[in-house]
UniProtKB/Swiss-Prot annotation:
This protein is involved in the repair of mismatches in DNA. It is possible that it carries out the mismatch recognition step. This protein has a weak ATPase activity. The keyword Transcription does not apply. Belongs to the DNA mismatch repair MutS family. One of its GO terms (molecular function) is damaged DNA binding. One of its GO terms (biological process) is mismatch repair. PANTHER family: DNA MISMATCH REPAIR PROTEIN MSH1, MITOCHONDRIAL, DNA MISMATCH REPAIR PROTEIN MUTS FAMILY MEMBER. InterPro entries: DNA_mismatch_repair_MutS (IPR005748), DNA_mismatch_repair_MutS-lik_N (IPR007695), DNA_mismatch_repair_MutS/MSH (IPR017261), DNA_mismatch_repair_MutS_C (IPR000432), DNA_mismatch_repair_MutS_clamp (IPR007861), DNA_mismatch_repair_MutS_core (IPR007696), DNA_mismatch_repair_MutS_N (IPR016151), DNA_mismatch_repair_MutS_sf (IPR036187). The keyword Nucleotide-binding applies. Pfam families: MutS_I, MutS_II, MutS_III, MutS_IV, MutS_V. ATP binds at residues 671-678. This is DNA mismatch repair protein MutS.
Length: 923
């Protein structure tokens, strides 16, 4: 479900979003103020500050009450009807904001901008103003963000090309880190780009939002905001960008096309509006060249579960399996790389070189990882400080970051010739000023509050004026302590206490049994009764009032001086912002390199050979996610080879048991359900993706020619919202592959044609294979239960038949998970159905039907078959299933199936573990 917001300060409020302000005579001054502010911010939930709560009224209250599960009450009347109202405490507002933003809502935060006492003196309502617009794509607070994921705002612009060919300009920013990127693509590539970047919020023009072709897909985004066309005006784009970056021309910052500039300018314009003039520091727009990354369409990303499982969980995804990073920034960078594998051979090699350096030196790797654990999230701390939302702990984060940089540099100095990426990271870590770090260390106290308004974050001795003010404040408090002792002595009440709250200020508190003593002469002349509670009585004195004024003045002066120091330090940090951001990125880069090295060593990954050929040769390939799951269960993963190269590989065939390298760019894979066909398909796609990400891969050897597009058609799901059946979804995805796959593409197809009649499905699968072979000429893996398709290898020279090995023993199917040359003649569907728990009568009946089908011509009519086979009345007399083999018999059969002369040492060890797992469990 998506939400739509319109932020348009330049147009009148829309009556269906904000109720018009009532004439002053009909509403209270406070409600008149509310209507005025609400009308200026249509389409946003208005958090209206009233004391210690943010209140919501009218439709906003009803929406928030449903979304947050909080009580809906009422406050007065409006036009004769009750005013719906709900509220959230200010101190817990971040929790509620996080939930609203996650649901796609936008919020305007309206604060009190003067002291209520000043408003009372003016005999007027407290002044209030909107201080921030919070939208899904413009978050900076840690409490509202996922530390391990980027939070992107994307602008989408379109231009009408010649001959009706449209072009799309895209710009995306993360204001919490300063990242800013742009690119241009064809309309047909938009969905893949959106899936890769996965923006938290997209802004588009009204016209594009309503477009018949692109509008439906845009409205499927998590949050989309239509804006007026002038926001995307390319004629004013460069001027707006120059204004944001405070430069005379963009030539020295970025070379953008007119369309890219329009999208980039829309981004900074929207940021200006939502941040109310405060400008987060952004890097100059980085232009992403067309074809620089592997194109992966949305269906393929979902099917391969790259960053999220089909259920939407991170756990169980490829990212979860390979993420060994120790910093939030490193985790974000790894996710970025996984979403956008490179297609440039040299850039991939540079990443692999960095990983290899840490694979070769385990001691250095662990030293770096230990130091990185102390590196804070500097980029997000910088963004908060620049927007005035930072606190003392953000200052400390930057101090600690520079300190961690020195430790990392000292350890990296052990490398005699650091690879390119590591050398670049070292240079970036040297950039921040060490003088700034020392200044922060001198200024900040050891125990820091979360908020700067709490004070106490400046170290004693840093500034003389602050020290003097603190002494005056603290001395006044000592006077209060002495006064408490004197009052206790004068009244004879040993339990007398002097306390403080925001309502009474300083007051004297005694138990109820002593209250009458202070209210009786002569003590009542000194102690003025203020409040009686269940167990206590409270009093004030003139002397306490005088002391309170002195303490308050000293405390306010001390806090004011601390805030001045904070602003001074924040300004110093802002000046050094570019250097600090470079160091933050260097930490992330080193974290990813060391994390992938740790993964490679612990899970036995190898460095892939990635080149510009069309090769695809994998030995001993494994599925990275499934292998980890089996390892946790104490079971081995059966490795397999795959060769989709146009020529034989340059290295020897794999050892027996790992599978044998075939000779075909298209592999037709047959075998029963649950034998591992889908796992085999996916693992090869994931190995290619990991290799071009710059990671080592789960294999014993791998050579991969650059893959420019990755396609996956696996699994089955309908799309009822669009009126698409499961089969229709399958055909749409297959059509995308056949229309777009190039010779550099890698395609995996699973069970094409199964969602319709047998001969229809067989015909579609047949024609699809021929098209892949003759037209696309790409590398492909095609799994099927249509065994008739294996005959195509006789006429298609680059088609290779492969099968997943199984054994049948005493009516049971044993899955060996080995991929070998050849084809399967059976699918063992009934045996799998039996494993799934179908009733024995159904299994027996299915076997009898299958036997009849196999004994007769497959073209025999269903009516004849129905006449020949007795109905379910015969099921009761169905033969009894033979008992399953005992554990000892299964063990004997497994030993007989082994061929010791064909096993490598590693395979022999795996086989031994597998046999051990079959032993009866001890009681």
């Amino acid at each position: 479900m998506h939400r739509v917001m319109t932020i348009r300060p330049d147009i009148p409020p829309q009556p269906d979003i904000a109720a018009p302000a009532e004439p002053p005579a009909r509403v209270s001054p406070m409600m008149e103020q509310y209507h005025e502010i609400k009308a200026a911010n249509p389409g946003l939930l208005l958090f209206y500050r009233m004391g210690d709560f943010y209140e919501l009224f009218f439709e906003d209250a009803e929406i928030a009450s449903r979304a947050l599960g909080i009580t809906l009450t009422k406050r007065g009347k409006h036009l004769g009807a009750d005013i719906p109202m709900c509220g959230v405490p200010v101190e817990r507002s971040d929790d509620y904001l996080h939930r609203l933003i996650a649901l796609g809502h936008r919020v305007a935060v309206c604060e009190q901008t003067e002291d209520p006492a000043a408003a009372r003196a003016r005999k007027s309502v407290v002044r209030r103003d909107v201080v921030r617009l919070i939208t899904p794509g413009t978050l900076t607070e840690d409490t509202l963000l996922d530390a391990r994921a980027n939070n992107y705002l994307m602008a989408i612009a379109r231009t009408r090309g010649s001959a009706g060919v449209d072009r799309i300009g895209l710009a995306w920013i993360d204001i919490s880190t300063g990242e800013f990127c742009v690119t241009e693509c064809a309309t047909g590539e938009l969905s893949a780009t959106l899936a890769r970047i996965n923006p938290n919020e997209a802004i588009v023009s009204d016209a594009l939002y309503s477009d018949a072709e692109l509008g439906p897909s845009l409205r499927e985004l998590a949050a989309v905001t239509p804006l007026t066309r002038d926001v995307f005006d390319s004629a004013t784009a460069e001027r707006r960008l120059c204004d944001y970056f405070a430069v005379a021309t963009m030539d020295g910052l970025a070379a953008l096309s007119r369309l890219e500039a329009a999208a980039a300018a829309a981004c900074v314009t929207y940021v200006d509006r939502t941040q109310l003039g405060k400008r987060p520091p952004l890097s100059p727009p980085a232009r992403e060249a067309a074809g620089a990354t592997m194109a992966i369409d949305p269906a393929t990303r979902a099917n391969l579960e790259l960053t999220r499982t089909l259920g939407g969980e991170r756990r169980g995804s490829l990212l979860d399996a390979i993420d060994c990073t120790v910093t939030a920034a490193g985790s974000r960078l790894l996710a970025q790389r996984l979403a956008a594998p490179l297609t440039d051979e040299a850039a991939i090699a540079r990443r692999l070189d960095a990983v290899a350096a840490f694979v070769a030196d385990s001691a250095l790797r662990e030293q770096i990882r230990s130091a990185l654990r102390a590196a804070p999230d500097m980029a997000r701390a910088l963004a908060r400080l620049s927007l005035g939302r930072g606190g003392p702990r953000d200052l400390a984060s930057l101090r600690d970051g520079v300190s961690a940089a020195d430790k990392v540099l000292a350890q990296l100095s052990q490398l005699a010739q650091p690879p390119h990426d590591i050398a670049a990271a070292m240079a970036a870590l040297r950039r921040p000023s060490r003088d700034l770090c020392q200044e922060l260390a001198r200024a900040l106290a050891d125990d820091l509050p979360l908020l700067k308004r709490d004070g106490g974050f400046v170290r004693d001795g840093y500034e003389a004026a602050l020290d003097e003010t603190r002494k005056l404040r603290d001395a006044s408090r000592l006077v209060v302590a002495a006064m408490q002792a004197r009052y206790a002595d004068e009244t004879g009440v040993k339990g007398l206490k002097i306390r403080h709250n925001n309502v009474l200020g300083y007051f004297v508190e005694v138990t109820a049994q002593h209250g009458d003593r202070l209210m009786a002469p002569p003590l009542n002349a000194t102690f003025i009764h203020r409040q009686t509670l269940a167990g206590q009585v409270r009093f004030t004195t003139a002397e306490l009032g005088e002391i309170e004024a002195k303490i308050a003045n000293a405390g306010d002066r001390a806090l004011g001086l601390e805030l001045d120091i904070f602003d001074r330090l924040a300004a110093m940090i802002d000046t050094a912002g570019d250097d600090l951001r470079a160091a933050a990125h260097a930490f992330a880069l080193l974290d990813v390199a060391t994390a992938l090295a740790k993964l490679a060593v612990s899970d036995n990954y190898v460095r892939p050979e990635v080149d510009g050929s069309l090769a695809f040769a994998i030995e001993g390939g494994r599925h990275p996610v499934v292998e980890q799951a089996l390892k946790r269960a104490g079971e081995p993963f059966i490795a397999n080879a795959c060769d989709l190269s146009p020529v034989p590989p340059p290295f020897p065939p794999p050892l027996a048991g790992e599978g044998r390298v075939g000779a075909g760019q298209i592999w037709l894979l047959t075998g029963p359900n649950m034998a591992g066909k889908s796992t085999f398909l996916r693992q090869n796609a994931l190995i290619a993706l990991l290799a071009q990400t710059g990671s080592f891969v789960p294999a014993s050897r791998a050579r991969i020619g650059i893959v420019d597009r990755l396609f996956s058609r696996v699994g089955a799901a309908d799309d009822l919202a669009r009126g698409r059946s499961t089969f229709m979804v399958e055909m749409v995805e297959t059509a995308t592959i056949l229309n777009q796959a190039t010779e550099r593409a890698l395609v995996i197809l699973d069970e094409i044609g199964r969602g319709t009649a047998t001969f229809d499905g067989l015909s579609i699968a047949w024609a699809a294979i021929e098209h892949l072979h003759e037209q696309n000429r790409c590398r492909a893996l095609f799994a099927t239960h249509y065994h008739e398709l294996t005959a195509l290898s006789a006429k298609l020279p680059r088609l290779f038949n492969a099968t997943v090995r199984v054994k049948e023993w005493r009516g049971e199917v044993v899955f060996l998970h080995e991929v070998l040359p050849g084809s399967a003649d059976r699918s063992y569907g009934i045996q799998v159905a039996k494993l799934a728990g179908l009733p024995p009568s159904v299994v027996a009946r299915a076997k009898s039907v299958l036997a009849k089908l196999e004994a007769n011509d497959r073209g025999q009519s269903a009516r004849t078959l129905a006449d020949d086979l007795p109905l379910f009345a015969m099921t009761a007399r169905a033969p009894v299933e033979p008992p399953p083999p005992s554990e000892a018999e299964q063990l004997i059969e497994a030993v007989r199936a082994l061929h010791p002369d064909e096993l490598s040492p590693r395979e022999a060890l795996d086989a031994l573990y597998a046999l051990k797992a079959k032993l009866p469990k001890a009681d």
